[in-house]
Amino acid sequence: LDEYSKYILYIDKYQKKLLMWFDRLTLDVQQEYALKTVLKKPSEYVTWKLEWERKIKLFCDSSARGVYIYGTGVYGQATLELLELWGVRIAGFIESNPVAAEYKNYPICKVDDIANGLCVIVAMDYKNTLSVSEFIREKKLNVLYIWRYFLII
């Protein structure tokens, strides 16, 4: 099996119903898997990381109506921390089935209430990213998928 298949098998083997726990585990496994790559070629990693950060910053700067983060799980929280570190203020969060009205004083909007054409950072693992892709196409959102950024941070 190639490395990615081993990674997927490893994740599937330990999948639990608690989504936050699973997201945290996924992030940890991705980073552990990626760490070997980073240690082999650290200069390539630095270049890769800086390029991703440049993409994220440019995406945020391109939105006149503000940027939304799709997901309030581990990836969404990490994305918010990263953006706050850079001084970027988001417009809010998007959830498929919100359980709260806000997170850290940012509104959490239901997907059905989102206007077409918004700038959205999809902050979820690859599997969940696939599950929301149809909605993203329907709403014609300007989207940045960042699950790869969290493979190695």
Segments from the language model and where they lie:
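Hydrophobic, well-ordered beta-alpha structural blocks that scaffold small-molecule cofactor pockets
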Residues: 4-153
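C-terminal "capping" alpha-helix adjacent to the active site of nucleotide-linked donor transferases
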Residues: 1
